[in-house]
Amino acid sequence: MNTENRSPEQFDIPLFLKNLPKLPGVYRFFDEGGKVLYVGKAVNLKRRVSGYFQKNDHSPRIALMVKQVHHIETTITRSEAEALILENNFIKALSPKYNILFRDDKSYPYLMLSGHQYPQMAYYRGTLKKPNQYFGPYPNSNAVRDSIQILQKVFMLRTCEDSVFEHRDRPCLLYQIKRCTAPCVGHISEEDYRDSVRQAATFLNGKTDELTRTLQHKMQTAAANLQFEEAARYRDQIQALGIMQSNQFIDSKNPNNPNDIDLLALAVSDGLVCVHWVSIRGGRHVGDKSFFPDTKNDPEPNGQDYAEAFVAQHYLGKSKPDIIINNFPVPDALKEALEGEHGKQMQFVTKTIGERKVWLKMAEQNAQMAIAQRRLQQSNQQHRIDELAKILGMDSDGLNRLECFDISHTQGEATIASCVVYDEQNIQPSQYRRYNITTAKPGDDYAAMREVLTRRYGKMQEAEANGETVKWPDAVLIDGGKGQIGIAVSVWEELGLHIPLVGIAKGPERKAGMEELILPFTGEVFRLPPNSPALHLLQTVRDESHRFAITGHRKKRDKARVTSSLSDIPGVGSKRRQALLTRFGGLRGVIAASREDLEKVEGISKALAETIYEHLH
């Protein structure tokens, strides 16, 4: 792999194009400020990159991008497939403005069976680690939790954390309601529990017929040995499996060994693009999800380009199914890259018959319905913005970005300020910020509000003065009454800001829908009707700000209390405190530990274990 760079100050695009090699690779376009505009891959770098500057038939999105190109960087690769993987890595790392981006930064969740002596069944998101078993990925957390509930009913596996499991002396409620076999207190042998784990894994791998035959054999054996309670338990499992099977997709092409299958349906309408993903794992439909890339810079989106971008971003470097059924072609280079990572051949199916054709048709209908719903949502959001703009005396076109602030603490402890952002007709969680309040006295909400507003907008002024691009809000919402909004006005005067301010107070009766709006620059204080679209928008942003502030405050408070509880114990410094928390999984586990358990922690003597135990009890 070889990278070619040239100093941006002396960059000559025609000369650069003349010297480009006719080799596969990745190219990156930058603007005058050095910000990456676009990343692409090519079989022939010279032909591909030169085409941007020699042709005039580009889409509006690409034409707008080309006008801003100041300099170019390229990286030569050994093949188009290698270039595709590198391109995808660059796109994920740099988020270029003019690339097609399917914004779903979180990793997908899995169902995990841990490598513990008595494996835990759990929801998992993150890097896959041995010796745990993972099943998925699932489209969303609800799909994982639904599967866990099913497995609890049939196989009764534990879901508690290891730190809790190791310190129980009696069964929990899940045992009482027949959702767990209580391995924590020895109500099931290790061999029998592992047999249940194997059965659950067999079910998750889609081998339901094989599992049913195994359970039937065990039921008959138990009955022959006059073990009627055990035989009844196997009978109940078989019945539960039958009910679940009737509600699942089963791939009749290979019913005894179902494959992992993904369905991808592309739909394009009225400038919107949707890719609908359906996940089938082990013959079970575990969920589906609609993805919408940002098309605001592309009034005439090419669906095939977006579909290819989705496949690359969704699968490269991630878990892959054996079969992908889709209503668009997948380029050979992309197939090669995916199969290279997967380690075996994958099937890409566009021509379907029978039930697979029905599945794909359903996915297409869901994609089209998702676009219709998105259009309706956008229309509703625009209506809300229009009404709020009218209230603020602004043009609708001038009101896009709202920022909202809230303060949270418990009697002055662990004060946190939140700033949430509403932009492009939706909340923008990736742009949220929390601020630890450091200068205000505990419990002084006014000083806390002054600190957060001064820090945020003072820093933005400094950044702008240094030539950085800053995204200012079109209006700022303050969760609070006249006192809080008065502080905001004074900060505006100090910083010389002229951004519209809106205060939202709970009103005399503190009921939803009875909020009072405060417009400090006109002196108006009034209520909107409970069905007002503008009020609904303000409530949504305000509630999100409150949620974000209070969750941050609770984390900070709980962390401080854990540290304080152990730090107050003579002989427990930072290293021993960390060793205790790591060993027992948190303060709750330390409190539940016996004196003997505490002694087993490195650095904890018998005398110190006694001191810790007495302090916590």
From Swiss-Prot:
Gene3D superfamilies: 5' to 3' exonuclease, C-terminal subdomain, GIY-YIG endonuclease, UVR domain, UvrC, RNAse H endonuclease domain. GO terms for molecular function: DNA binding; excinuclease ABC activity. Transmembrane segments: none annotated. The UvrABC repair system catalyzes the recognition and processing of DNA lesions. UvrC both incises the 5' and 3' sides of the lesion. The N-terminal half is responsible for the 3' incision and the C-terminal half is responsible for the 5' incision. GO terms for cellular component: cytoplasm; excinuclease repair complex. CDD domains: GIY-YIG_UvrC_Cho. GO terms for biological process: nucleotide-excision repair; SOS response. SUPFAM superfamilies: C-terminal UvrC-binding domain of UvrB, GIY-YIG endonuclease, RuvA domain 2-like. Interacts with UvrB in an incision complex. The keyword Transcription regulation does not apply. Pfam families: GIY-YIG, HHH_5, UVR, UvrC_RNaseH, UvrC_RNaseH_dom. Residues 209-244 form the UVR domain. The lineage of its organism: Bacteria, Pseudomonadati, Pseudomonadota, Betaproteobacteria, Neisseriales. Belongs to the UvrC family. Keywords: Cytoplasm, DNA damage, DNA excision, DNA repair, Excision nuclease, SOS response. The gene is uvrC. This is UvrABC system protein C. Residues 22-100 form the GIY-YIG domain. The keyword DNA damage applies. It is found in: Cytoplasm. SMART domains: GIYc, HhH1.
